[in-house]
Amino acid sequence: MHINKEHAYSNLVIRVRQSYPSYSESKIDDGLRLYWFNDCEEINLWTYWQGRGNLDAQIMLVGQDWGCPWDPNYQPTIEQVRKANQNDEYDYLNNNPSPTDANLIALFKELGYIITEPCPNLFFTNLVLGYRNKGLSGGYRKAWARQDKGYFKELADIIEPTVILCLGRSTFEGVLSAFDVKRSSRIKNYNAFIESTNNPVAVTLENGKTAYVFALAHCGAMGTLNRNGKKSTDLEKQLADWRKIRAYLD
């Protein structure tokens, strides 16, 4: 990792933080809006799981948005974040209630990673870098991704990953937009696209290298159900999708 990467990353975090208003308890009655979470000292709260200091990671995992860090259910996770900020030993997954995160543990095993431990080759973030003032899902707005796509592109150019793994259609389309990829036709069936030879999509990083952007199903309960045609919530199809990523890794 080079010092210019550290400087560029720190500068990016500052600018993203400044682009969002600060949250106060009164904001919960404002309707669904995004704010900055002041305890987040990384680009995203997900980065505390995998990504702190990993600015040469080969694999970037990208979700839609983190959700609401003020939600009571996620206070154990936030306590771990605060420990990390104090350079204390921490475990992002300690009492973590997220089914998405639990399924990711199984999916990353297909790539040979045990993500219950620190993995210097991984960097986790969400495309939308602000935080909901209430609720954990639903009500997603494409304008949120438009606001942050330039920041995401900067982040990818800093890290220079080989593969960018996108959880869900909105995330995949947002990442392609960040790289100004113009598709000739709209994706009509996301499951079919995941399985097609058009996946992954090659994009060019600022350094001229190619990164491969993978369309993947979201691995939360609803995304998994959709990937299985509403028939089950098992991970077999997603495990098969993830196996295809291996060919693009060293």
Language model segments and positions:
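Short flexible/disordered coil segments
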Residues: 108-115, 177-202, 234-239
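Short amphipathic alpha-helical segments
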Residues: 1-2, 103-111, 199, 240-250
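Short, flexible loop segments at boundaries between secondary-structure elements
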Residues: 185-227
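C-terminal/domain-terminus segments
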Residues: 224-250
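A polyanion-binding, active-site-adjacent surface
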Residues: 2-165, 169-183, 211, 219-224
